[in-house]
């Protein structure tokens, strides 16, 4: 069974078991728990679709891989090995299936990584706060998904999920949530 992401997904990072449950109920499909085993277990119990394990470097992959295997994670972030497309190539060369590698890029690099055939993770948040920051993150998320990003990292989960649903409906890759027809 292939685990390729069929549509865009929302990722968030959590630091407590309570945050893991809250993220799952808010609609996050992918949760980055770092290398905290208690969070890994909590996230798996929350039935989040995908778990990304380990913020580490190449030296950490032997330590993080058993954690990922014990938790049932199928998607390893290419940043485990160093980040970017070269790390993804190294991971594929080391025997990790391409459909299990998630490449973390900047918004400007989404198109190139997607065209190269990788599943793409992009962080759309910035350091600003408030409604303007949420709107900007939503706009960035929509453009990134249109260009091929599979996973969006954000702290604005519900708002970004709505933006992604709208973008996928416009693109034709998902039906609209509701259709309204009328005469103007």
Language model features with spans:
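Active-site-adjacent loop and "lid" segments of alpha/beta metabolic enzymes
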Residues: 1-26, 38-184
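Alpha-helical structural signal with a strong bias for long, charge-/Ser/Thr/Gly-rich
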Residues: 30-31
């Amino acid at each position: 069974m292939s685990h390729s992401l069929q549509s865009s997904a929302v990722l968030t990072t959590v630091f407590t078991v309570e945050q893991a449950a809250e993220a799952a109920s808010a609609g996050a499909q992918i949760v980055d728990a770092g290398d905290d085993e208690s969070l890994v277990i909590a996230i798996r119990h929350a039935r989040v679709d995908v778990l990304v394990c380990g913020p580490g470097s190449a030296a950490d992959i032997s330590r993080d891989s058993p954690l990922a295997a014990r938790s049932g994670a199928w998607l390893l972030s290419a940043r485990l090995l160093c980040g970017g497309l070269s790390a993804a190539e190294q991971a594929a060369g080391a025997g990790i299936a391409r459909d299990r590698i998630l490449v973390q890029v900047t918004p400007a690099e989404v198109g190139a990584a997607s065209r190269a055939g990788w599943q793409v993770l992009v962080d759309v948040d910035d350091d600003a706060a408030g409604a303007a920051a949420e709107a900007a993150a939503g706009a960035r998320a929509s453009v990134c998904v249109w260009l091929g990003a599979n996973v969006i990292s954000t702290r604005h989960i519900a708002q970004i999920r709505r933006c992604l649903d709208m973008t996928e409906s416009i693109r034709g890759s998902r039906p609209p949530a509701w259709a309204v027809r009328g005469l103007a």
